[in-house]
Design a protein with these regions (language model features):
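Short, charged, surface-exposed hinge/linker loops at domain edges
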Residues: 1-4, 37-70
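Short aromatic-glycine-(Arg/Gly/Cys) micro-motifs in beta-strand/loop hairpins
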Residues: 7-22
């Protein structure tokens, strides 16, 4: 499954990762890579919780987001 993850760096230098299609699924890390690892774990836990409660799992995505400099 693939989910869109938004990563932003806050004013303290921490990287905040969140999954818009999974409300409340947010994690952070001191580095971008750490934030990615942490959000992967958070998504796994989130999906497991949905399954345990019999809630539907949001559909995965098949798209790519790119940054373009102008």
């Amino acid at each position: 499954m693939k989910f869109r993850v938004l990563i932003e760096q806050d004013e303290d230098g921490m990287f905040i990762a969140q999954v818009p299609s999974l409300p409340g699924c947010i994690s952070q890390g001191k580095t971008r890579d750490e934030a990615i690892r942490n959000i992967q774990e958070a998504v796994i836990g989130y999906i497991e919780s949905l399954k345990e409660h019999g809630d539907p799992i949001p559909p995965s995505i098949d798209e790519e987001i790119l940054d373009v400099s102008v």
